[in-house]
Amino acid sequence: MTILRKTHPLMKMVNHAFIDLPTPANISGWWNFGSLLGLCLIIQIASGLFLAMHYTPDTLTAFSSVTHICRDVNYGWLIRYMHANGASLFFICLYLHIGRGIYYGSYSYTETWNIGIILLFLTMATAFMGYVLPWGQMSFWGATVITNLLSAIPYIGTDLVEWIWGGFSVDKATLNRFFAFHFILPFIIAATAMVHLLFLHETGSNNPLGIPSDCDKIPFHPYYTTKDFLGMVLLLAFFFTMVLFFPDLLGDPDNYSPANPLNTPPHIKPEWYFLFAYAILRSIPNKLGGVIALIMSILVLALLPHIQTSKQRSLMFRPISQFLFWLLVADVLALTWIGGQPVEPPFIIIGQIASLLYFTIILILMPIAGIIENKMLKW
């Protein structure tokens, strides 16, 4: 008798993806973040669904409906803070996942990598629109500033901005459509993640050595299901510590004031996970140039498979590239810090140097390091 999971049409798909999947025997904890991102997405969709039941996307009542959720709905405060901090956790896992991909050369799987970049853009769009919904001061002004960037597009810019706003300023129509998009996008993300997995399972997982592992594979279950489960337990422990003890640590105090179009906050800034891109945007004095740099700060990842010069895939045995990788990590952290600072000396010049360094490391120094390391192999 054949096992049901190997014959049933639906269970067969699950079996090939999560049970009998041949997996490299030596992948480390850095490979846990894919499943952790899945957990984050489930947390966000579940908590978001319950929030949507009580939220009203109207400029007059949006702010008070969020207050009502926190005060009057059973465990509403918990659901709200789970959703807000869940977004931060999502981006922490996302950036670690991308960092792992760069370090171990996972970008060589071009289709998987490119769909990952699309997932990053979708997640950033979802998070931005979600930040607008509570209709606090930073929600309103963040939406105004970021949507206004589209006016930098020549000829059609102004029309495009007014089309997105649904009027001549960020108002009820904008809030309404942002709520609609914020609700539907996570399901599109979930579907795209399935495609991401589909392409990954076509090639199989990479491993820390960056070498083919066909000769040494083990089934995903029970070895990596238990490993993923441990990762999830640790993630949830960290998550609930944040939610229950430091719920506002990563938020902006300005968002506890209702949106006021007549009063501009002293420092308009997005959530912490966009600050590095915001710093790159601000470091260029030209509006269109800044928008192009902002988009390129993410799109530059798509160039990685095409500018790799090294004969080795992973950075594990490449000391120069390792140094440049950690320099890049430090640079992104510096950009994150700068993005949260006011636009005044010395922050302006630090931001410009850090932005220049970001693109220089990825586009120039890393390919050069690869060539040098190839020569070192022959010594």
Swiss-Prot record:
Cofactor note: Binds 2 heme b groups non-covalently.
GO cellular component assignments: mitochondrial inner membrane; respiratory chain complex III
Matches recorded under Pfam families: Cytochrom_B_C, Cytochrome_B
Annotated TM spans: 33-53, 77-98, 113-133, 178-198, 226-246, 288-308, 320-340, 347-367
Cofactor or coenzyme needed: heme b
Family annotation (PROSITE patterns): CYTB_CTER, CYTB_NTER
Keywords from the named record: Electron transport, Heme, Iron, Membrane, Metal-binding, Mitochondrion, Mitochondrion inner membrane, Respiratory chain, Transmembrane, Transmembrane helix, Transport, Ubiquinone
Chief place of localization: mitochondrion
Residue numbers binding heme b b566: 97, 196
Domain of life: Eukaryota
Bilayer topology: Multi-pass membrane protein
Any one GO biological process: mitochondrial electron transport, ubiquinol to cytochrome c
Location of this chain's protein in the cell: Mitochondrion inner membrane
PANTHER family: CYTOCHROME B (PTHR19271:SF16)
Family note: Belongs to the cytochrome b family.
Miscellaneous comment text of the record: Heme 1 (or BL or b562) is low-potential and absorbs at about 562 nm, and heme 2 (or BH or b566) is high-potential and absorbs at about 566 nm.
Subunit structure: The cytochrome bc1 complex contains 11 subunits: 3 respiratory subunits (MT-CYB, CYC1 and UQCRFS1), 2 core proteins (UQCRC1 and UQCRC2) and 6 low-molecular weight proteins (UQCRH/QCR6, UQCRB/QCR7, UQCRQ/QCR8, UQCR10/QCR9, UQCR11/QCR10 and a cleavage product of UQCRFS1). This cytochrome bc1 complex then forms a dimer.
Function field: Component of the ubiquinol-cytochrome c reductase complex (complex III or cytochrome b-c1 complex) that is part of the mitochondrial respiratory chain. The b-c1 complex mediates electron transfer from ubiquinol to cytochrome c. Contributes to the generation of a proton gradient across the mitochondrial membrane that is then used for ATP synthesis.
The protein's name in its UniProt record: Cytochrome b
Organism of provenance: Dipodomys venustus (Narrow-faced kangaroo rat)
